């Protein structure tokens, strides 16, 4: 039975020319299958490669068979021998030597032997190089070196297979769309078709080394097209880290990007890696290889262990630092960040210097009502020596061993320590009038931070002495001046400050109520009842007793101008305690809301009360109130929290540490049941964290803050304007955070949460807002935009816009309400109806923004300043109200208080004339403060470095305004900083910024969103030029500027994401996102267009994005931008477009054809012919068009592309590529033969002949193949070239020593000879037979492998043909 089956199988098997029997299939390649064969004559096994003739024309088939017959003459132990070829009607069969063990690629498969050790790879690669040396000597370039084409015998002998013919098959295939070779092993010049040479095989050898070591070649994790892109784009393929130095150097030699710098195969055979492995092989291949491999692994492991240990030590060091910080942050006092940054670790001298700029915060001893009772005796008893001792230890960073952390003791000592902080900041010259407001907040912050390094004994030194409860000093704050005590004069900031003003406030002490209180207290002191009491309870009872006699309403008294300043503090303390006690969940909703609102007003009047609140109560009670499911309560509590943390980094850190961030974040989401008011309060809280300090920003990010910022990028820009601004500025702050976390990680988090589509939608909205605002403001789109520098004082900045076309940006700001006690009026408009930009993200200018020059206008004139101040003094008494009235009015009236139109307009004009602000792009938050009306006592603009800026000390100026001559000091300080503040007026209090430069971002944002909201007050004056004319125009201009500023920021954000890694870029490559982005190309102005094009260009550098860009019609949208001709950004725009198109079209013929269809060819030719610097992109693109498709070649011819190619023959660098493009165009010419006709012109023929004659030696080898294509594809061109001087040039170069050049020259001479009109004349005139004979007889001495075998064979066959023609 078995014999019958065998017989049956034998009869079914195929035979080839009755000489070979086809057996099993043993492989499959790009152009056919490989079968095992049996030679029926001698029984030898052979390999038979079967190639389909479906797409190969007869002419090319003959060439291929001639090539095989030529290759039969090659004979070397390290190459597979060609035995012949056979042709049937449907297939070409190539007969090859059979190598029994198969390919190395098959052996290293994971299910077989796996990757080889370096030593074994060296053994195999040495033999590969031997084979290549032979092939290259014979003039053959393999072009497809890889593991699958390296075959082995049982004895370990390596043979190179599949050389020479693959190229011919690829060129003959009329449907091919790829370059020759296998993608992952291809050299860059092969991919770019810029001239294949022997060095191309060396690159492939390097790829094969990595393949044998890792089982896969470089870039194998990519698809073929992206892999080709990376091969051309990268400096060199990735080399595994674990390799030895020798093999790494070997690979670097192979991967030289410039083929001329790569060593040849013969040189690489002497490389140390190959030599050392050969010596090791002689002793013991297997043992030596194993030991070496183990040593490498051990060394690598030890290195990794050392790295891990170093990292662990570094990490542990960081942890120690963190733990120390944490331990100090547990102090009960507010200064939890005293040791967290270097700027806080000030020396006494530093503090003294800061003290010279101390503020008016310290007027009236900077009284905190509940602490003022304990303060005065410390004033008398603290000595300079105490101060020096205190700070000496503080500077050394000593910490108490037994620190008492009870809140009561902290309270008890706060005032004393606070006072010491003030003592240290007293200037030496007490008579100087230089007390400015350069650092108003420092007094409070330094005082609060100081105790964190004070020992227990030092704290005891500042404990409350007997008699500390005396109110004598409290009610006589100025009496000490007359006493003239030097010690007290030098340590009392309020005394010196008030004394400078020569204020008559002491007359207020003659008030009857104060007289009665002092008399009562004096009586009690004489009776000894209160002399030793440190408890304020008896004191308050005394006060209340006196007050009952006069039946005074506390609520009405708080802001009653008739009550002297010294009488307000104890009354506010009582009110403060009552309000705080009502902040409990069991209180009614109305009570909680009312208490929160009154506390907000109180904190604005006296910001130092915040210290008391945070120290005694903290944020936890407020967090409990946030659990109440009532919107009014939540909103009111959030307002209170925001007022407390405003511009105070310590309080913000405190709030973060107790877990307030996640709680507030829960109110920031876009849930439908969440009121907009609550959301904007939460947004302001988060904005403060982002913009105050790096530490709070880190805590915000750690609590998953980035997704919250993404959520603020609402689609409805008109409705959520400021929230969108907050998100944009917040993202920039995140990106600017200088920490070990890579920016790419932040990009990935944001991209994962959907920021990219939101950014593009925001970009669209902002662009529309810019366009509409520009149109409405009368801008024609060509007028220059003032982005920084002085504002024109002749043009009013703020006003009411009467047109309705700005509806998109005329909405009230989301974050601009209720933080001044309700809907706040704009600081800059002349109407109290507009809301001010309280939560001002506009002040953020990230470093990523391009810097703009900023300037500040000269300070205001003295007379103008006095006018403003006098105006506000007049209105003081008429507009004061109680806390309750303040809150009710703030909540109930959106148009503010009725004031005369003259009063409204004058402050605005003063601002315009005196201090036109300018933008400051320093990367820091500029600080702009404005006072606008009864609804706001202090503007709330965020500050990144609060300690560098001035703050207002509540309403102490408000109480002392009529007496302190601050205007004089204001003039001396050269600013309006000390202008007194009156809450009913619409005036600008301050325009401050770091180094004197203020940001208009806040002003412009407030104007754009607040002023445009429209109460009609400004427009009520039809005859005023400032009401609806210039003001409306300037509002529109500034609105456009604000939108344009954020438009640029969004474009820069997109650019940041486009620069990120592949994962982030993949989020950008969704179809809808890219389509919307590309649609904006013709909508945006050139600066924004340039940024969007940069994004596209960055995406095009990632091979994984190319397919997505193609599907989104990137090429179709990019090319029209090349039509731009005018403008200073045209070159940059063209650069980005061409670079992106170059990346898209490189290698890929489909995209090249798409670019040609969309009209790129005329643009490319223009760049080339005008010798533009951008021709570096245009030239390769234009040359690639010849390879793309018939349609692209037709367009090339129609636009004169062939003439450009011919002109490029004079360009040394591009000549070879241009010649190859000409050859391709001719080879693919259609039946009309238009390319042939163009090349037959006399000037074209002459250019070709001249180029061959003058071609540089280094390019000579590369031009022979294109010339061979040209003369073999067109016999007419062949004859014309031959009779116009090409023939003698060909024959004269036969003495070239390179075998590849000689072989191609012989092929050219043979082709010319076969079509020459006068062959005998050619033979005789050029003495061709003798030159051929010299080639045949060459090599007598010492050349190995029999010399240039193929050259001799070719010369011999040509000589025989000449002999026949001579005889005939």
UniProtKB/Swiss-Prot annotation:
It is an enzyme of class 2 (transferase). GO terms for molecular function: ATP binding; protein serine kinase activity; protein serine/threonine kinase activity. Induction: Expression is cell cycle-regulated, with higher expression in G2-M phases. SUPFAM superfamilies: ARM repeat, Protein kinase-like (PK-like). Residues 488-502, 791-808 have a biased composition (Polar residues). Autophosphorylated. One of its GO terms (cellular component) is microtubule organizing center. This is MAP3K epsilon protein kinase 1.
């Amino acid at each position: 039975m078995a014999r019958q089956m065998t017989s049956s199988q034998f009869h079914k098997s195929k035979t080839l020319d009755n000489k070979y029997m086809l057996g099993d299939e043993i492989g499959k390649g790009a152009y056919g299958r490989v079968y095992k064969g049996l030679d029926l004559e001698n029984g030898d096994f052979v390999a038979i490669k079967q190639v389909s003739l479906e797409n190969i024309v007869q002419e090319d088939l003959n060439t291929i068979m001639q090539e095989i017959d030529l290759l039969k003459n090659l004979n070397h132990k390290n190459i597979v021998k060609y035995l012949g070829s056979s042709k049937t009607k449907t297939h070409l069969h190539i007969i090859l030597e059979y190598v029994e063990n198969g390919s190395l690629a098959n052996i290293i498969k994971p299910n077989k032997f796996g990757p080889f050790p370096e030593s074994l790879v060296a053994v195999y690669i040495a033999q590969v190089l031997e084979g290549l040396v032979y092939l290259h000597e014979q003039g053959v370039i393999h072009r497809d070196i890889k593991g699958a084409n390296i075959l082995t015998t049982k004895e370990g002998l390596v043979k190179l297979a599949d050389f020479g013919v693959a190229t011919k098959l690829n060129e003959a295939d009329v449907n091919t769309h790829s370059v020759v070779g296998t993608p992952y092993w291809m050299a860059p010049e092969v991919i770019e078709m810029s001239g294949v040479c022997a060095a191309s095989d060396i690159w492939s050898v390097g790829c094969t080394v990595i393949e044998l070591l890792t089982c896969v070649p470089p870039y194998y994790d990519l698809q073929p097209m992206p892999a080709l892109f990376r091969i051309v784009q990268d400096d060199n393929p990735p080399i595994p880290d674990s390799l030895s130095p020798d093999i790494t150097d070997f690979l670097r030699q192979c991967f030289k990007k410039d083929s001329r710098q790569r060593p040849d195969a013969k040189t690489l055979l002497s490389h140390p890696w190959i030599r050392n492995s050969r010596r090791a092989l002689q002793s013991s291949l297997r043992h030596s290889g194993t030991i070496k491999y183990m040593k490498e692994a051990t060394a690598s492991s030890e290195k990794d262990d050392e790295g891990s240990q170093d990292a662990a030590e570094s990490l542990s060091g960081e942890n120690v630092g963190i733990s120390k910080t944490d331990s100090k942050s547990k102090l009960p006092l507010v200064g939890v960040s005293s040791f967290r940054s270097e700027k806080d670790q000030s020396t006494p001298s530093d503090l003294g210097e800061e003290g010279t700029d101390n503020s008016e915060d310290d007027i009236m001893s900077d009284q905190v009502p509940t602490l003022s009772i304990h303060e005065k005796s410390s004033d008398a008893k603290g000595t300079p020596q105490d101060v020096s001792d205190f700070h000496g230890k503080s500077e050394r960073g000593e910490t108490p061993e037994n620190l008492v952390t009870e809140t009561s003791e902290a309270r008890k000592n706060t005032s004393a320590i606070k006072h010491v902080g003030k003592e240290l900041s007293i200037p030496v010259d007490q008579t100087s009038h230089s007390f400015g407001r350069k650092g108003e907040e420092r007094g409070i912050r330094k005082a609060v931070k100081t105790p964190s390094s004070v020992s227990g004994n030092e704290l005891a030194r500042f404990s409350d002495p007997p008699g500390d409860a005396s109110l004598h000093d409290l009610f006589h704050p100025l009496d000490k001046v007359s006493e003239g005590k030097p010690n007290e004069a030098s340590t009392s900031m309020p005394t010196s400050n008030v004394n400078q003003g020569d204020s008559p406030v002491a007359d207020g002490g003659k008030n009857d109520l104060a007289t009665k209180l002092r008399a009562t207290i004096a009586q009690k002191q004489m009776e000894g009842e209160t002399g030793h009491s440190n408890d304020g309870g008896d004191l308050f009872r005394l006060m209340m007793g006196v007050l009952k006699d006069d039946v005074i309403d506390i609520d009405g008294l708080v802001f009653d101008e008739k009550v002297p300043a010294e009488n307000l503090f104890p009354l506010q303390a009582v009110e403060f305690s009552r309000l705080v006690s009502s902040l409990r969940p069991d209180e009614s909703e109305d009570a909680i809301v009312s208490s929160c609102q009154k506390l907000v007003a109180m904190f604005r009047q006296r910001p130092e009360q915040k210290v008391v609140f945070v120290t005694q109560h903290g944020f936890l009670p407020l967090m409990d109130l946030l659990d109440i499911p009532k919107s009014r309560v939540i909103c009111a509590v959030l307002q209170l929290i925001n007022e407390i943390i405003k511009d105070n980094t310590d309080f913000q850190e405190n709030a973060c540490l107790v877990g307030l961030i996640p709680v507030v974040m829960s109110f920031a989401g876009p849930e439908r049941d969440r009121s907009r008011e609550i959301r904007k309060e939460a947004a302001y809280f988060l904005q403060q964290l982002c913009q105050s300090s790096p530490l709070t920003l880190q805590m915000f990010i750690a609590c998953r803050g980035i997704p919250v910022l993404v959520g603020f990028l609402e689609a409805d820009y008109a409705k959520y304007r400021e929230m969108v601004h907050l998100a944009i500025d917040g993202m920039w702050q995140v990106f600017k955070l200088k920490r070990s976390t890579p920016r790419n990680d932040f990009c990935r988090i944001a991209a994962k949460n959907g920021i990219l589509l939101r950014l593009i939608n925001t970009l669209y909205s902002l662009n529309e807002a810019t366009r509409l605002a520009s149109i409405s403001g009368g801008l024609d789109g060509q007028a220059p935009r003032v982005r920084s520098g002085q504002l024109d004082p002749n043009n009013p900045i703020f006003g009411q816009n009467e047109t309705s076309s700005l509806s998109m940006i005329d909405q009230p700001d989301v974050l601009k309400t209720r933080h001044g006690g309700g809907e706040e009026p704009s600081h800059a408009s002349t109407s109290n109806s507009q809301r001010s930009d309280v939560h001002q993200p506009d002040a953020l200018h990230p470093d990523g923004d391009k810097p703009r020059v900023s300037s500040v206008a000269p300070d205001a004139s003295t007379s103008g300043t006095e006018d403003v101040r006098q105006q506000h003094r007049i209105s003081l008494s008429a507009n004061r109200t109680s806390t309750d009235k303040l809150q009710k009015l703030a909540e109930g009236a959106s148009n503010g208080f009725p004031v005369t139109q003259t009063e409204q307009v004058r402050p605005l004009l003063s601002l315009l004339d005196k201090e036109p602000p300018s933008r400051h792009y320093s990367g820091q938050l500029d600080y702009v403060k404005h006072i606008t009306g009864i609804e706001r006592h202090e503007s709330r603009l965020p500050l990144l470095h609060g300690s560098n800026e001035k703050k207002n000390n509540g309403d102490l100026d408000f109480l002392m305004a009529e007496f302190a001559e601050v205007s004089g000091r204001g003039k001396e300080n050269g600013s309006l900083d000390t202008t007194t503040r009156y809450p009913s007026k619409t005036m600008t209090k301050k325009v401050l910024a770091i180094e004197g430069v203020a940001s208009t971002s806040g002003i412009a944002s407030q104007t754009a969103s607040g002023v445009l909201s429209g109460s009609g007050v400004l427009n009520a004056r039809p005859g005023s030029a400032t009401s609806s004319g210039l003001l409306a125009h300037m509002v529109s201009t500034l609105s456009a500027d604000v939108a344009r500023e954020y438009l640029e920021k969004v474009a820069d954000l997109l650019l940041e994401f486009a620069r990120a890694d592949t994962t982030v870029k993949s989020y950008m490559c969704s179809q809808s996102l890219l389509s919307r982005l590309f649609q904006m190309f013709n909508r945006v102005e050139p600066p924004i267009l340039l940024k969007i094009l940069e994004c596209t260009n960055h995406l095009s550098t990632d091979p994984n994005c190319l397919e997505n860009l193609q599907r989104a019609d990137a090429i179709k949208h990019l090319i029209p931008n090349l039509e731009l001709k005018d403008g200073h950004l045209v070159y940059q725009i063209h650069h980005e477009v061409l670079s992106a198109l170059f990346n898209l079209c490189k290698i890929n013929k489909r995209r090249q054809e798409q670019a040609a269809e969309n009209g790129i060819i005329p643009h490319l030719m223009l760049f080339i012919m005008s010798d533009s610097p951008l021709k570096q992109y245009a030239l390769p693109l234009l040359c690639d068009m010849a390879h793309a498709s018939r349609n692209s070649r037709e367009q090339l011819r129609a636009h004169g592309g062939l003439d450009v190619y011919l002109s490029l023959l004079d360009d040394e660098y591009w000549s070879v590529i241009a010649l190859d493009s000409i050859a391709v165009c001719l080879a693919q010419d259609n039946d009309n033969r238009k390319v042939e006709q163009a090349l037959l012109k006399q000037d074209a023929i002459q250019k070709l002949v001249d180029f061959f004659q003058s071609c540089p030696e280094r390019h000579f080898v590369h031009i022979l193949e294109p010339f061979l294509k040209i003369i073999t594809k067109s016999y007419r061109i062949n004859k014309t070239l031959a009779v116009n001087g090409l023939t003698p040039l060909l024959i004269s170069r036969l003495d070239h020593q390179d075998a590849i050049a000689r072989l191609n020259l012989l092929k050219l001479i043979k082709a010319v000879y076969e079509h020459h009109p006068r062959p005998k004349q050619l033979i005789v005139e050029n003495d061709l037979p003798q030159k051929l004979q010299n080639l045949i007889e060459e090599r007598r001495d010492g050349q190995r492998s029999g010399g240039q075998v193929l050259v001799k064979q070719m010369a011999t066959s040509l000589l025989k043909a000449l002999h026949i023609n001579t005889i005939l």
